[in-house]
Amino acid sequence: MTQPRHFIDLWKLDGATLRLLLDDAHARKAARKGWPQGKVDADAPAKDRVLSMIFQKNSTRTRFSFDAAMRQLGGSAIISTASDMQLGRGETIEDTAKVLSRMVDAVMIRANSHADVERFAQVSTVPIINGLTDKSHPCQIMADILTIEEHRGPIAGKTIAWVGDGNNVCSSFIHAAPLLGFELKIACPAVYHADLHDLARAEGLQGKVSMTTDPKAAVSGADVVVADTWVSMGDTDHDERLAALEPYQVDDRLMDLAAGNGVFLHCLPAHRGEEVTDAVLDGPRSLVWDEAENRIHAQKSVLAWCFGAIG
């Protein structure tokens, strides 16, 4: 039996596959220029396919973008929360995965625990897609890189500065850096540092990834500056986080240290006045609205790949 193509972590794929997905996303987006959102792509790679979406966390961009993506690929999506399902009453992940494998063509999970997604994938006979976990957010990084390339050309050779909490999104940037050939400079307080195992893996792949506690050093000369919320869903140390991360706010003075055509990204939702100022988020260097839209286009290519329509 052919093993399903799971999309769980970028480091489990190779650079050629990520490049294929990005090129496909660029082409699909360009081909749709001026189309209504509900019009199906010419090749309809998800025709007659059904995607199950399971949410253990609240979602705006992931929920709407995956639903729109499936519609544009010619398929459909079923949306549920864990509390809607028997998962919320004690049915095991393994039993749930076996049942859904008989009813849908792929499962996207936005989970509290990365281990839950891995357990789904171990027994599922259909592709499992990581829509966000506590450990990584690969779909977001594909959208981010798509956005960077739209505005600044190929990602290879670029320098990205991550400023703030070394969280799950930061981890996926670390995973991508050695595979796509960009430099990643991380600035974070020591108490909220990036995952050391991820850093070691990137180093083993000769990735140009570094970490500092100095945001100015990380941002200096960078092509792209990326921030994220300092307090994620489920975090209980709100006050401690704000105190530790206050020096890492991205404002115009920090952005002025970036390259002359440096741009700003944020996966949203943003806590305005905390990790980023209004002036940066709404300013001419911000690409966050294109970035949000590009979740659709990047995920369409992920889905097409999972279904075997490309690659």
Swiss-Prot record:
Residues engaged in binding carbamoyl phosphate: 59-62, 86, 110, 137-140, 267-268, 295
Residues the record lists as binding L-ornithine: 168, 228, 232-233
GO biological process terms on file: arginine biosynthetic process via ornithine; citrulline biosynthetic process; L-arginine biosynthetic process
Entry superkingdom: Bacteria
GO cellular component entries: cytoplasm
EC number: 2.1.3.3
Biological or metabolic pathway of the protein: Amino-acid biosynthesis; L-arginine biosynthesis; L-arginine from L-ornithine and carbamoyl phosphate: step 1/3
Single annotated GO MF: ornithine carbamoyltransferase activity
Catalyses which reaction(s): carbamoyl phosphate + L-ornithine = L-citrulline + phosphate + H(+)
Pfam families attached to this UniProt entry: OTCace (PF00185), OTCace_N (PF02729)
Subcellular location field: Cytoplasm
Family named by the database record: Belongs to the aspartate/ornithine carbamoyltransferase superfamily. OTCase family.
Cross-referenced HAMAP family: OTCase (MF_01109)
Function: Reversibly catalyzes the transfer of the carbamoyl group from carbamoyl phosphate (CP) to the N(epsilon) atom of ornithine (ORN) to produce L-citrulline.
Full protein name: Ornithine carbamoyltransferase
Lineage, top ranks: Bacteria, Pseudomonadati, Pseudomonadota, Alphaproteobacteria, Caulobacterales
